[in-house]
């Protein structure tokens, strides 16, 4: 039997959501490139990144869709929620308005993804402690009340960026193992052992507009 030309067993689709300027694209760039881009133009539409990680001995390719935070792009970016296995919902710990808008982002995520989508709340810019406008405790309480994973991170220093993507992947993989995530479901957001480079559900999305590393 021919061996599939892949060095991973699963593909997980992620989306990154949240207000404009919270650092979504900077988190993605830090995770995929191990670099911080200080001056990122805002994302126009959707951007895309990938990286292979390991969870419980399994190689997993993350396909990550970074969505624009501006209201005028919401209709476009909502189409990318479909079939997401994981969602990273980001706010800026120094801007309370971005935290106050989380309920709206969460409503979209709940309504447009499958019931088993793993959502992790990320308080970005943890390196700016002196400018903090949202406490760790209140964000943690919001996460607990809504059944979300939670951590604070810094796209600038790299603090907890790796953990944000990995913790979501661990939970998704756990859901696969315990049977709560049906890999045969069209909206699972997971592919197991793909057999062709462009085959399957996860690469059927429209091509994103790539306009630099927007925050």
From Swiss-Prot:
The protein's location, in the record's own words, is: Recycling endosome; Early endosome membrane; Golgi apparatus membrane; Golgi apparatus, trans-Golgi network membrane
GO cellular component entries:
cytosol; early endosome; early endosome membrane; endomembrane system; extracellular exosome; Golgi membrane; Golgi stack; intracellular membrane-bounded organelle
Keyword Metal-binding attributed: no
Q: Motif Switch 2: residue span?
A: 68-77
* Residues the entry annotates as binding GTP: 21-26, 38-40, 42-43, 69, 124-125, 127, 155-156
Query: Which residues are the lipid attachment points (S-geranylgeranyl cysteine)?
Result: 213, 215
Keywords, ordered alphabetically: Acetylation, Cytoplasmic vesicle, Endosome, Golgi apparatus, GTP-binding, Hydrolase, Lipoprotein, Membrane, Methylation, Nucleotide-binding, Prenylation, Protein transport, Transport
Q: Where is this region: Disordered?
A: 188-215
SMART domains, per database record: RAB, RAN, RAS, RHO
For this protein, the record's Pfam families field holds:
Ras
What does UniProt list under activity regulation?
Regulated by guanine nucleotide exchange factors (GEFs) including DENND6A and DENND6B which promote the exchange of bound GDP for free GTP. Regulated by GTPase activating proteins (GAPs) which increase the GTP hydrolysis activity. Inhibited by GDP dissociation inhibitors (GDIs) which prevent Rab-GDP dissociation.
At the top level of its lineage, which domain of life is listed?
A: Eukaryota
Query: What CDD domains does the database record attribute to this sequence?
Result: Rab14
The protein's required cofactor(s) are namely: Mg(2+)
EC number(s) reported in the record:
3.6.5.2
Is GTP-binding set as a keyword in this record?
yes
Binding of Mg(2+) occurs at 25, 43, 66
Q: What reaction does this enzyme carry out catalytically? A: GTP + H2O = GDP + phosphate + H(+)
Domain note: Switch 1, switch 2 and the interswitch regions are characteristic of Rab GTPases and mediate the interactions with Rab downstream effectors. The switch regions undergo conformational changes upon nucleotide binding which drives interaction with specific sets of effector proteins, with most effectors only binding to GTP-bound Rab.
State the family named in the UniProt similarity comment for this chain.
Belongs to the small GTPase superfamily. Rab family.
Q: Which PANTHER family match?
A: DRAB11-RELATED (PTHR47979)
Protein name as annotated: Ras-related protein Rab-14
What is the organism field in this record?
Homo sapiens
The protein's gene is named RAB14
């Amino acid at each position: 039997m021919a061996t599939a030309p892949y060095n991973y067993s699963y593909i997980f689709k992620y989306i990154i959501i949240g207000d404009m300027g919270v650092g979504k694209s900077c988190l993605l760039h830090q995770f995929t490139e191990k670099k911080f881009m200080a001056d990122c133009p805002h994302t126009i539409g959707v951007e895309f990144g990938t990286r292979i990680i390991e969870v419980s001995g399994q190689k997993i390719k993350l396909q990550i869709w970074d969505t624009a935070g501006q209201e005028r792009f919401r209709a476009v970016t909502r189409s990318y929620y479909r079939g997401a296995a994981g969602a990273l919902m980001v706010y800026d710990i120094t801007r309370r308005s971005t935290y106050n808008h989380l309920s709206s982002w969460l409503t979209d995520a709940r309504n447009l993804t499958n019931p088993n989508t793993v959502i992790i709340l990320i308080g970005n810019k943890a390196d700016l402690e002196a400018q903090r406008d949202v406490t760790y405790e209140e964000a943690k309480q919001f996460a607990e009340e809504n059944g979300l994973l939670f951590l604070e991170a810094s796209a600038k220093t790299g603090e907890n960026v790796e953990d944000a993507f990995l913790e979501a992947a661990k939970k998704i993989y756990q859901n696969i193992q315990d049977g709560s995530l049906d890999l045969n479901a069209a909206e699972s957001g997971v592919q197991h052992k793909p057999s062709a480079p462009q085959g399957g559900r996860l690469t059927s999305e429209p091509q994103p507009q790539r306009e630099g590393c927007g925050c």
